[in-house]
Amino acid sequence: SRNVKEYGNRVYNRYPARSIFLVPRAILSHQADRPLNVLDPFMGSGTTAVETVLSGNVPYGLEMDPFARMVAEVSSSIFTGEELIAMRETFNTICANWIDFESEHIPQLTGIERWFKDGDLDLLLKLKSAILSLSPQRFLPFFLVTFADAIKPVSLMERQSLKPYISTKYAKITKDVLSSFMYSFEAHM
């Protein structure tokens, strides 16, 4: 699944349950006589919603996981050219100013600090504060998903594993906060 983009997949986040886009694409390609309302009762990260939008149909989905709902919302959103320019400007503003923000919005998770090198959690929280303060409401879900995707490369958690652990055998070389966020932004644009 490392090269799924080559085959048409739109990977907006490494959400563990994303499905293969070819199934909804094949089904929707045989329903071309009129626009459809498509219900996905287990929406996950929105693969069916994306294919539904791309085929000119209207997606509806149900998902209990709030993060998965946000990923699905972002992945199936259509932005105008002007909005894409505004998103880039917002991104540039965040990148230029994030370091001056306070480390707020600390997750109430026991032992969260152990997953990061010294100082990295503080830097991530500064970036999150900047995103929450500087992003227009229309773009906020996009920037939050981009931020979420940037966390794992900064953390000590193994990137290729869905199981959360820190390898004691092979020390992970982490990315810095800003370059990880920039990489995620470019990958999602």
Protein language model regions, located:
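A short hydrophobic/small-residue beta-strand
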Residues: 38, 49, 59-61
